[in-house]
Amino acid sequence: MRAALVCLLAIIHREALRFVSQRGRFLAAIVRPLVWLIVFAAGFRAALGLSIQPPYLTYITYEIYIVPGLCGMIQLFSGMQSSLSLVYDREMGSMRLLLTSPIPRWWLLFCKLFASTIISIFQVYTFLAIAGLLGIGFSPSGYAAILPALILNGLMLGALGLLLSSTINQLENFAGVMNFVIFPMFFLSTALYPLWKMAEASTILRDICAFNPFSHGVELIRFALYGQVDWIALLWVVFAFAVFLFVSLWGYDPSRGMVRRKA
């Protein structure tokens, strides 16, 4: 038990040091959603009318609507960046040393997931603080209530990145696959538009959005900001996390997985 805790703290410390040393990564993580919030929202404010739907009790501005989606976007990019570092570590050989330690492999990978989730949560709260300074804020209780939602969403997206990293053996291939996953997952979700708005354009797109795990992660954050729980979204996120993690652990198993030659 003590060894497992030491392992967790060591990996969190390692990821934190790596994050601090990569200032450009932090800057990009904050600037990217701010550009969407300031520029994109201003352009689409008049074009996208929003009806009153849970968790909202009154009409809201488009800026308020997309904040949960931008929080999810931060965690999505953070999860993929963390997985990119896994591919790099595997190419450099440090992953082999880590995975051959006496600590169970599944715990090592979970520690990596948890560390990347903590970093993504720090980025989200930094973004929310800046958004609050721009006049787009929420209640103090809402900021506290989203923490469990951010943890679950971060773990789910981190597990997805872990799954992708278990299938890719070369660093140069990961960027293309990462973009192939990130952008469809983000745009085909409720991050930017509500489901009913998507249904007006295409029922097929609406169904894709409804089955997208990222949509449910965004809705979990959205409801949590108002002190509510979207139970369907919660079940989806937990289920997706379990599936992604299970396949990832299988992929990193040297006897059965997809990276046995590299790990």
What annotation goes with each model-predicted range?
Residues S85-T117:
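Helix-loop-helix units of permease transmembrane domains in multi-pass membrane transporters
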Residues R105-N179, Q228-G251:
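Alpha-helical transmembrane segments and their short interhelical loops
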Residues E15-M92, V124, I136-I146, G176, ...:
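Transmembrane helix-boundary elements of multi-pass transport/secretion proteins
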Residues A3-H13, A191-L235:
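Short hydrophobic, aromatic-rich alpha-helical segments embedded in or entering the lipid bilayer
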Residues G43-F44, L86, M95-L98, I130, ...:
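Hydrophobic alpha-helical interface/terminus motif in multipass membrane transporters
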Residues A42, A46-L48, S165-F211, S215:
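Transmembrane helix segments
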Residues A10, R14-R18, G93-T100, N169, ...:
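Short amphipathic alpha-helical coupling elements at transmembrane boundaries
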Residues P33, T61, Y65, G69, ...:
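Transmembrane alpha-helical core positions of polytopic small-molecule transporters
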